[in-house]
């Protein structure tokens, strides 16, 4: 229930849907399995295992999930069958098979195999924080995060969400913190970072499980490299990697949050309810604090 990586989008709090409206809209775009010659199918599914509902509400938060099912048809299988058919035509009809005919045979083979192909599925979850006005997506890859945002917009007929563009870049802030050897406010340096240089061949330095205030680490910044990823700890509650794209990776929710969730959840539903609220609230407050050190939002 705890997101291990996060992309987020600021929302217009005044125009967020109620839980029942959101559920009705998502029902019109509910997931169905791949059929016939479809290569994939995508739609909304239940975000929690103990309920069939498409929205899991917890106080000021709403959890949703987008599921994608894709057919798996290895190119090698198609190639082997195609070679057999081409050889059969050449032997039986004593003629060569041209490029156009090979393409037609390949398409026919694909159509024959597709209904019987294996499938693989994936899902992307998101939580609406209606109190703070954020959509938190459980994926740091921009393509995955933007896809569920697009599907939500399509289902709702629009959703006012924007990219997290701040006046100062995350890379600039991270570079400054590493150079001065400490962070501001409730943030502390952890033990991992990534730095990049400039030039035709961009040098990349990855530091893992080291003291980030050590001279050999700081020297990379003094030599002109900028920080693109930085390990941070926030108020002894959350450890994470901040990226230059303002996404969060390798998130760890420390004992104080885990124990609070467990103390408020007596069963699967109760634990999910408490975890969702604590995660959304703590992450959102942390993001707002980060935004303040980044100079606020771009106008």
UniProtKB/Swiss-Prot annotation:
Keywords: Cytoplasm, DNA recombination. PANTHER family: RECOMBINATION-ASSOCIATED PROTEIN RDGC. It is found in: Cytoplasm, Nucleoid. The gene is rdgC. One of its GO terms (cellular component) is cytoplasm. This is Recombination-associated protein RdgC. May be involved in recombination. It holds the Pfam family RdgC. Belongs to the RdgC family. GO terms for biological process: DNA recombination.
